Amino acid sequence: MIIKYDANIKDESIAANLKRITNQIYKLLPNREEGSDWEKPLSTLLEEIAGMDRLLIGSHEILFPLLCKLEGLFLLTQEEDFFLFRRTIFECLGLTSQLAKNIYG
């Protein structure tokens, strides 16, 4: 796949990165449930996805809502917010799946 700067990146490399990001998004759930740090990994994910948004031309329609939903997780810190947190995680996983389909067909 040709990305910004005319760099030709192998589809396998992008697929592996998307799989890793998907796993990291999913891991936010048990981290929060167990009282582990979930905010620092979330910040790292946001940084990576923002960078991906700058590199993957034509994927902004998916990456922007993904960034918005992940950023919104920082607001869901109360115990009663957990089900919304969980639902948002699964919506984000759906967006990463949609992104993979758009890239690979």
What are these regions (language model features)?
Residues 1, 42, 102-105:
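Short intrinsically disordered terminal tails
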Residues 1-39, 93, 97-98:
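Short terminal alpha-helical segments
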Residues 1-5, 9, 50, 54-57, ...:
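Generic preference for well-ordered secondary structure
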Residues 23-69:
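Amphipathic alpha-helical interaction modules
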Residues 68-105:
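Amphipathic alpha-helical binding modules
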